[in-house]
Amino acid sequence: MVLLQTIAHAKINIGLMIPYKREDGLHEIRSVFVPIDFGDPMEIQIKSLPKGIVSRFVFHSTNHLQGYRHSLFEAVSERGDLSQNILTKTFHKLKPYFQEALEIKVQIQKHLPPEGGIGGGSSNAGVLLQHLFPYTNLSRGEQIQFAKSIGADVPFFLQSSACFVTGIGEVMEPIRLAKGFGILAIPPFGLSTGSMYASLQKSLQKPYGSEVWKSLTEDLIRSLHVGDWVYLQNRLENEFEKIAFQTQPLLKELKLGFFESGAIFASLSGSGSCLYGIYPTEEKRNEALPNVSLRFPKMEFRTFSF
């Protein structure tokens, strides 16, 4: 038996551009994905079963989410319809590839919010796959494609480095990033990824239809290396922000609030609704936390670093 204690980390997006809609109906992206030290603690137990026994999945969870998100997770937990949980779906899809019958038990402390743009479900699935792929014969390339079939962000969570990400999220180039200290805001409302992408109304183009953000320029790479966030602020923007701010004006006020509290970079993460601010030092970040918490009492705030 193998017993693993791990954390499914959230990610933030530093810049997010969607240059075009692909012929397969999915959207091409350009973004820097960064794993942060806020996540869901997970315990994974893997046990071999005797021949003739079918592989099985056991799931237990503690729900730490607030507001409507608490109900969303309950609905797909062992207290609701577990067949709709991303981890259950991941297990059953991977089960035919196991080289032996396995019993997989997962226990999770759920903190990462759905509809937040920080990879709440994708992170859980990615961590589970990391530990189950060794029980298959899938090559690295096949693992990436399998993870992609679970969700566009899932391949990123098979590894732990910040990456420049293209494709629909499966093409990753590791990059070196300066240490950063931030505050993550979790609003009491979510933004549907599907609705946000639909609102972009991107035209259908062939894969070679845009050269924008095809690669990071030397000045952007240097700025990410040294942490020149002021330089990056107006150069790595999230294309979803305009739509998010129109849909939920409080998010625009929140971004301004981060800057007024001393942040040197602030952005929506993914398609939202989570928004974050990055501060010059850990001390400045800690000083800002009570200020933004007081100004936005309905928000949940989490400090993070990377």
Swiss-Prot record:
EC number: 2.7.1.148
Disulfide links within the chain: none
Binding site for ATP: P113, P114, E115, G116, G117, I118, G119, G120, G121, S122, S123
Class of this enzyme: transferase
Keyword Protein biosynthesis found: no
One Pfam family in the UniProt entry: GHMP_kinases_C
Reaction(s) catalysed (UniProt annotation): 4-CDP-2-C-methyl-D-erythritol + ATP = 4-CDP-2-C-methyl-D-erythritol 2-phosphate + ADP + H(+)
Keywords associated with the record: ATP-binding, Isoprene biosynthesis, Kinase, Nucleotide-binding, Transferase
Keyword flag ATP-binding: yes
Top-level division of the source organism's lineage: Bacteria
Active-site residues, Swiss-Prot/TrEMBL: K11, D153
Example GO biological process: isopentenyl diphosphate biosynthetic process, methylerythritol 4-phosphate pathway
The protein's annotated pathway: Isoprenoid biosynthesis; isopentenyl diphosphate biosynthesis via DXP pathway; isopentenyl diphosphate from 1-deoxy-D-xylulose 5-phosphate: step 3/6
UniProt GO molecular function: 4-(cytidine 5'-diphospho)-2-C-methyl-D-erythritol kinase activity; ATP binding
Reported function: Catalyzes the phosphorylation of the position 2 hydroxy group of 4-diphosphocytidyl-2C-methyl-D-erythritol.
UniProt cross-references to HAMAP family, sorted A to Z: IspE
Sequence similarity: Belongs to the GHMP kinase family. IspE subfamily.
Protein name, entry field: 4-diphosphocytidyl-2-C-methyl-D-erythritol kinase
Organism for this UniProt entry: Leptospira biflexa serovar Patoc (strain Patoc 1 / ATCC 23582 / Paris)
Organism ancestry: Bacteria, Pseudomonadati, Spirochaetota, Spirochaetia, Leptospirales
